[in-house]
Amino acid sequence: MHDLTRRSRERTDEILVDHAAEYGPFRVRELEWEPDAAAYDRLRERFDADAAGGAGIWLTRDDAVLCVRHEDEDAWSGPGGKREAGETFAETAERETREEAGVEGTIEGVIEVHAVSYVTSDHPSLVLPTVMFDGRYAGGEPEPNADDRVAEVRWFTERPDPLRYDALASFPMPTGNL
């Protein structure tokens, strides 16, 4: 195993252990993506700067979940994005929710973590985590942020369709709406 692959896997495993200790058990999905060379280089730079991975919140209020739709896309997801250097995954999720949707959320747990292996034929695999938190609405008016390429923010009482990521199909809907 290449040193970079080993180090990124070990760091991801540490994050899994730390989040399980803080939030309790959650699902882990092992995923594999094939980025182009430029995207891989950006991911590698973020890993080297301790800013690798990302986070989001599946934010609920009463009987609804908050989702965003990005420009040039028709699919929906919870707000979330890339982690910044020195930021915890929870801080990333809360910041991205404010930036993308204009609302505040309170994290209540972890739904799942995606351990994503970025694989190319020219570089060693890089394993990075994306933490998906469960959260409750804490305030603010939903407002799309064009600076983050968010075209629309909306509360859904039924699972939105289409979903940006297949994994969202298993996320809990408030009051049991599946």
Tell me the role of every PLM-derived stretch:
Residues 115-142:
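Active-site-adjacent beta-strand/loop module that shapes the phosphate/pyrophosphate-binding cleft
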Residues 6-56:
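Acidic, metal-coordinating catalytic segment for phosphate/diphosphate chemistry
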Residues 1-4, 178:
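A carboxyl-terminal module marker
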Residues 60-99:
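Conserved Nudix-box catalytic region and its N-terminal flanking loop in Nudix hydrolases
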Residues 59, 132-136, 154-157:
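Short, well-ordered beta-strand micro-motif
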Residues 104-113:
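A short coil-to-beta-strand element that immediately follows conserved catalytic motifs
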Residues 144-175:
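NUDIX/MutT-family hydrolases
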